[in-house]
Amino acid sequence: MKNIRNFSIIAHIDHGKSTLSDRIIQICGGLSDREMEAQVLDSMDLERERGITIKAQSVTLDYKASDGETYQLNFIDTPGHVDFSYEVSRSLAACEGALLVVDAGQGVEAQTLANCYTAMEMDLEVVPVLNKIDLPAADPERVAEEIEDIVGIDATDAVRCSAKTGVGVQDVLERLVRDIPPPEGDPEGSLQALIIDSWFDNYLGVVSLIRIKNGTLRKGDKVKVMSTGQTYNADRLGIFTPKQVDRTELKCGEVGWLVCAIKDIHGAPVGDTLTLARNPAEKALPGFKKVKPQVYAGLFPVSSDDYEAFRDALGKLSLNDASLFYEPESSSALGFGFRCGFLGLLHMEIIQERLEREYDLDLITTAPTVVYEVETTSREVIYVDSPSKLPAVNNIYELREPIAECHMLLPQAYLGNVITLCVEKRGVQTNMVYHGNQVALTYEIPMAEVVLDFFDRLKSTSRGYASLDYNFKRFQASDMVRVDVLINGERVDALALITHRDNSQNRGRELVEKMKDLIPRQQFDIAIQAAIGTHIIARSTVKQLRKNVLAKCYGGDISRKKKLLQKQKEGKKRMKQIGNVELPQEAFLAILHVGKDNK
């Protein structure tokens, strides 16, 4: 056991985690050169296309160190994006140490900080690594100072490497073996294994990634899931050397995978403890804290026949993604679907894309909203995650919106722009600290503004240099109103949105104008209105298409022309009474983009 090292790699997006893990795998000979490819651990197509890591992956490698010993390295690659920080905390729970990778050109960013604090809270040994020293812009001295200043760990002798060229990666491994402590635990004790992650395989059922804290797990053992009390047979187990390799046993301190022929998706929840049925452990390991979704949106299949398939797909996906929340919802405009909760907009996009790709579904999404706390006049507190669930105005005593605490790190040059953006988003500054050339800003901004497009706009106002980390702080009373969209006098529930009263006029007007461009012209006029309660705040009309009924009249009598026009007018009137308007998917997405183009 003293030769096992469990560690994960934490870093901001694009600081080179995945490339560094490629090099480590190459040096330890996990894959032959023929099988080696860039970002070997980002196995999802989506991860490769966007160049981001979404799911944590684990690898077990053997490394022969300079002291002649052979060490077993279990390492877990983690995502860097703010929406997936819960993946990071799960990976860290299985480790004794973490490599903190910082780009020697970019320096410390908000995500680096957030993940590093998570690691320190869990008492992990953090080993700083300066990556990308081959870049002309690299300034390792400055970045080492930044790490000490901002993060507060000693980085004077931080390992310097370039994962791309392979320089210094050997030193990273040596430092790893030297500084990260071996796992603790009792190999003879009763089995306790932590489920770090699980996913669904069409042939094997549920596959779980586990870390053995105490005891030993052998093939054929009967295992018991501690939270549900159900027992299963350990049919197959093994490790990843990126490839799945079968083993007969997993020893104390190791990380591996386990297949128990669990057919039910909720059979092995992530963060749960496995133990042996014949000799169970007394208590479960501390799990992970449940992550609360921050953004909710309705997802509806385009054709109602896909509803069943959609439900199964969500079930399988939620197994792999503990933070996805969903419940059935029906809408008069879109039929049956699900109200889903996500951690942020990127998470929402990724889930929607995975559903469309991996499960071949066509989906319509409604505008994302956050959860509001509503106190009704009867003093009852309810939580509303969809505009259609908001009680009538006269029943609301107080409406409170979620406030997010946003930590931003940015170069001083962009401070003015970023402050302007925060103020425009109704933010309140709570803290500002200068670290050399960097500024650490803390603002309290309403969650609704953060999830809408704050991240994109922060990046564009700071030319990509600012970085953001946010978490939910509290609910606070606010003057929010529901803006309804009426089409030909009928409310479309899927288009309603909740916004602050000060912005409601503008949002309503912009939305109506956007919709006007997106709804195809019909044979009759379509009136699009935005309303707060019964008060109409904006209107625009999609003009009808008209056939030229006078084309066949040459010269001729005016009364003849009037008769034809009158006849056409009556026909249009009749059409309008029975006509339905089909809304394209773009119309629903228009809400997302309200207020983006005119900035």
From Swiss-Prot:
Keyword Secreted (UniProt): no
InterPro entries attached to this UniProt entry: EF-4, EFG_III/V, EFG_V-like, EFTu-like_2, G_TR_CS, LepA_C_sf, LepA_CTD, LepA_IV
Reactions this protein catalyses: GTP + H2O = GDP + phosphate + H(+)
Keyword annotations: Cell inner membrane, Cell membrane, GTP-binding, Hydrolase, Membrane, Nucleotide-binding, Protein biosynthesis
Top-rank taxon, per record: Bacteria
Location(s), subcellular: Cell inner membrane
SUPFAM superfamilies noted in UniProt: EF-G C-terminal domain-like, P-loop containing nucleoside triphosphate hydrolases
Domain spans labelled tr-type G: 2-184
Binding residues annotated for GTP, in chain numbering: 14-19, 131-134
Single Gene Ontology BP annotation: positive regulation of translation
Enzyme Commission number, as recorded: 3.6.5.n1
Disulfide bonds listed in the record: none
GO CC terms of this entry: plasma membrane
Membrane topology, record value: Peripheral membrane protein
Annotated Pfam families: EFG_C, GTP_EFTU, GTP_EFTU_D2, LepA_C
Molecular function via GO: GTP binding; GTPase activity; guanosine tetraphosphate binding; ribosome binding; translation elongation factor activity
Main localization (coarse): membrane
Coiled-coil segments on the chain, per record: none
Function comment: Required for accurate and efficient protein synthesis under certain stress conditions. May act as a fidelity factor of the translation reaction, by catalyzing a one-codon backward translocation of tRNAs on improperly translocated ribosomes. Back-translocation proceeds from a post-translocation (POST) complex to a pre-translocation (PRE) complex, thus giving elongation factor G a second chance to translocate the tRNAs correctly. Binds to ribosomes in a GTP-dependent manner.
Family classification: Belongs to the TRAFAC class translation factor GTPase superfamily. Classic translation factor GTPase family. LepA subfamily.
Protein name: Elongation factor 4
Gene: lepA
